[in-house]
Amino acid sequence: MKALVSRLDSFGDVLLAGPAVRAVAARADHVTLLCGSRGAPAARLLPGVDEVLVWEAPWGGFEPPAVRRDDIDALVERIDADTALVLTSFHQSPLPTALVLRLAGVGYIAADSVDYPGSLLDLRHRRAPRAHEAEAALDLAEAAGFPRPDDGRLRVRTPPPAAAVTGPGPYVVLHPGASVPARAWSPERAAEAVRELAAAGHRVLVTGGPGERDLTAHVAGRHGTDLGGRTDAPELAGVLAGAAVVVTGNTAPAHLAAAVGTPVVSLFAPVVPAERWRPYGVPHVLLGDQDAPCADSRARDCPVPGHPCLNTVTATDVAAAVEKLLGET
């Protein structure tokens, strides 16, 4: 059986699909993961994925492309699957993707759907209220005939050794960036946290992507080690795997840390619900006002002056959370 799993949004979303992908892989001969370009690096980390098919959907992402008939026709020609799971967040519809899969001749399609699917779905599944994204995907997979083959935790392929980047000895990682501004702690607070953690005797590595070098340099200052722009996705997985604790917002590195089994201090902006997006399957401490006015708004930019949901969190709060997790592990 050739199976396809679709998760068209971001890096972290694709990581959260990982347990469901493994469930499919346990029964299928070949698994294709259909994802967007932001999710592709995560897709290549997932055990059970044989092929990654990258496509930018006009109904997803921060800057969706225009609808082009030739683009959709080209995707239809590339899809070769007998069965498919369409994984979406609770606020997204699977039906546009299901239509493309039907046009490609996929015989069995399953998805969570609030909307009436007509003939687009063979299994219209109902998501459990308040289910975590990883659990919701596993539930759908099981309903479609792919039971859990293992403990259902997040996993990635074994990352490369990171000692050449991290140096020797224990360390804490602080990742100050986020996919959207509403989910980011202020750089000043992050820099204070680096200083406070260093004063407590921790070696602090500050991570970030190629476009975040100015941010990571500012946050690391004289007390942290700046790794901004120095790691690709597998290398970042290795850095996070070696950390005692990772401090980050509700963004991709939180899920990557969970996938390598590292405890997380989660600076969680409630623009999306923590019950669905918190670090999954690892010890974690959730910081941030979950009842702030921005709650459940899915805002990209904070709609409340001063960003109080996160900026009321202090460096001392973060340092205390790190010590709590270290005491538990």
Go through each PLM region and give its residues:
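Catalytic machinery of carbohydrate-active enzymes
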Residues: 1-329
